[in-house]
Regions:
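Negatively charged, low-complexity tracts enriched in Asp/Glu with abundant Ser/Thr
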Residues: 1-16
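Low-complexity, intrinsically disordered regions enriched in charged/polar residues
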Residues: 2-3, 18, 29, 58
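Intrinsic disorder/low-complexity segments enriched in polar/small residues
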Residues: 6-7, 24, 70
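Generic structural "secondary-structure junction" signal
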Residues: 11-14, 29, 41, 56
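A short, structured beta-strand/loop element
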Residues: 19-52
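Mixed-charge, Lys/Arg-enriched low-complexity segments
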Residues: 50-80
Length: 80
């Protein structure tokens, strides 16, 4: 069995049933930033991970951050 280590960075509510979690995961010796949707289980009230997510290798993190900053600038410009 392969162990995955997880460290929660932040989580925030997306809507009444879903939250997004940002975690650092180590899998087979490689580190990833995992951004994933978690959905509330109606019977237990606990949140469970969904397949909807994006594991990002740490080497690509700076590129993703730059792309998100560009998207924010475009959206900000569209609002003014």
């Amino acid at each position: 069995m392969i162990k995955t280590q997880q460290r929660l960075i932040t989580e925030f509510q997306k809507n009444d049933r879903e939250m997004l979690k940002v975690q650092i995961q180590t899998f087979r010796g490689q580190e990833y930033v995992d951004i994933r949707a978690w959905i509330k289980d109606e019977s237990s009230g606990e949140y469970k991970a969904t397949p909807k997510g994006l594991p990002i290798h740490v080497e690509l993190l700076s590129e993703l951050m730059a792309a998100l900053e560009k998207a924010a600038l475009v959206l900000d410009g569209a609002r003014h």
